[in-house]
């Protein structure tokens, strides 16, 4: 990783934002202002290489005006895995123009993207209300991650990107939200076999960043294969459970 997350934590601890005027103190409403603090601090470290995901794509296409259509624009990203993780899809890419640029989307893979020397540091920001015991947040689709691992293996892409998570822990004090602590973790340093897949929540991997162990010491090739083994095992178990619960009790009525 290129970003000095320890410096980012030092800078944002103690920062405050006004309590939202409406809505619950969770999710996007409370988290967005802290996300901007993190973005600002990372941009201080890499002023010319830090982007929002949509900003990076807009900048890339703006700099290559002769590339028209989805195929030509997708070819600007020389990594199938990175293209899969960052692309907005063929229709959106084909319809892009200077007058019709991309806007921020909540389901973008990266909240923040640091790109330097063809290395992509994908950063996702999570916020947590420390006053409440809440379910771990959605991190990334288990299926999307499986597809990414397959592309990594197919194309031998194990050293051109990483995926990091940054958690802001905050607490409500009077009329302000105060950042009490922050944590960071690298997805590819976690044990892939321990990642929890919530099949009922759109197949999302869920964890609190502060709880994600960082004990995996093998390379990304082994990580990708280990994760795919874990995903396939869990998917087969889920399929068996679905058949046992929702198919077998009713088969006798239709035979």
Q: Across the structure, where does each feature detected by a protein language model lie?
A:
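Nucleic-acid endonuclease domains
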Residues: 1-109, 116, 121, 127-255
């Amino acid at each position: 990783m290129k970003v000095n997350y320890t410096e980012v934590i030092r800078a944002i601890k103690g920062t405050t934002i006004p309590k939202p005027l409406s809505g619950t103190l969770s999710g996007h409403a409370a988290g967005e202002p802290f996300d901007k603090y993190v973005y600002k601090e990372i941009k201080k470290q890499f002023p010319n290489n830090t982007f929002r995901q949509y900003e990076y794509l807009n900048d890339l296409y703006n700099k290559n005006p002769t590339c028209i259509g989805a195929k030509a624009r997708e070819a600007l990203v020389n990594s199938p895995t990175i293209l899969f993780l960052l692309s907005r899809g063929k229709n959106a890419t084909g319809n892009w123009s200077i007058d019709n640029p991309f806007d921020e989307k909540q389901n973008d893979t990266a909240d923040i993207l640091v790109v330097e020397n063809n290395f992509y540091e994908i950063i996702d920001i999570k916020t947590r209300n420390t006053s409440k015991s809440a379910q771990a947040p959605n991190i990334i689709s288990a299926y999307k991650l499986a597809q990414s691992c397959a592309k990594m293996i197919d194309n031998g892409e194990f050293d051109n990107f990483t995926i990091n998570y940054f958690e802001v822990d905050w607490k409500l004090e009077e009329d302000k939200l105060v950042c009490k602590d922050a944590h960071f973790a690298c997805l590819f340093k976690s044990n892939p076999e321990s990642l929890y897949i919530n099949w009922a929540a759109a197949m999302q991997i869920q964890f609190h960043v502060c709880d994600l162990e960082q004990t995996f010491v093998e390379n990304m090739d082994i990580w990708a294969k280990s994760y795919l083994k874990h995903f396939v095992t869990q998917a087969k178990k889920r399929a068996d459970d679905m058949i046992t619960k929702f198919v077998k009790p009713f088969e006798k009525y239709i035979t």
